[in-house]
Amino acid sequence: MGTGYHAAVMARVKPGDIVAVVGDGAVGLCGVIAAKMLGAKRIILMSRHDDRQALGREFGATDVIPERGEAGEANVKALTDEGVGVDAVLECVGSDASMQTAINIARPGATVGTVGIPHNVTIPFEKIFFGTVGIHGGPAPTRAYAPLLLDAVLKGDINPGRVFTYATTLDNINEAYQKMDQRQAIKSLLKISEV
């Protein structure tokens, strides 16, 4: 939850914003929760997986775009005021394609909050310079967000634990990773011991 919240903070999400979340893993889904917490009026989740789309909607996504590339970008922009793009983008993947999408759907003056660990990402400096798109991000300072987020969980305002769709013991850690890799689990929960 802390990393998804960090993406929203880095994207400078504020009340009334139209926000896009690129990535439907646990971090992206928690980014949906965070955008809602920060007052976004419209939250667009880019997701190709039915189970994640459903959970994203339950978490607060108002729209889901399953397409990628230019078609996905066009569909996101079609949901914005005059098609100019979103106010804030949460980039929660770390691939070059996801970063390019994030930049392409951002309106002039928007901010991309990136928390996906970058893998061969190229930043098109001229595009962000002339498009006046800001990029902020990095590792999440989760301890800084813990009091706020834990309070929201304990009050029942949010339930990010729903991203754990598979539970097993430490002895089956390889299976836990395989299930996530094969998109059979959003996030695996490892039980060290039964309490």
Question: PLM features: what roles do these ranges have?
Answer:
Residues 100-104, 143-195:
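C-terminal hydrophobic helical "lid"/dimerization subdomain
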Residues 11-13, 80, 93, 106-107:
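A generic alpha-to-beta junction signature in SAM-dependent methyltransferases
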Residues 21-24, 36-101:
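Adenosine-nucleotide cofactor-binding segment
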Residues 8, 32, 53, 99-103, ...:
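Generic hydrophobic/aromatic pocket-lining and core-packing "Φ" positions
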Residues 104-120, 135-136:
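ADP-ribose/adenylate-binding Rossmann-like module
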Residues 1-38, 78:
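Short internal alpha-helix immediately C-terminal to a glycine-rich phosphate-binding loop
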Residues 116-132, 144, 148-151:
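Rossmann-fold NAD(P)-binding glycine/threonine-rich loop
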Residues 48-49, 118, 141:
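Residues in the short beta-alpha loop(s) of Rossmann-like NAD(P)-binding domains
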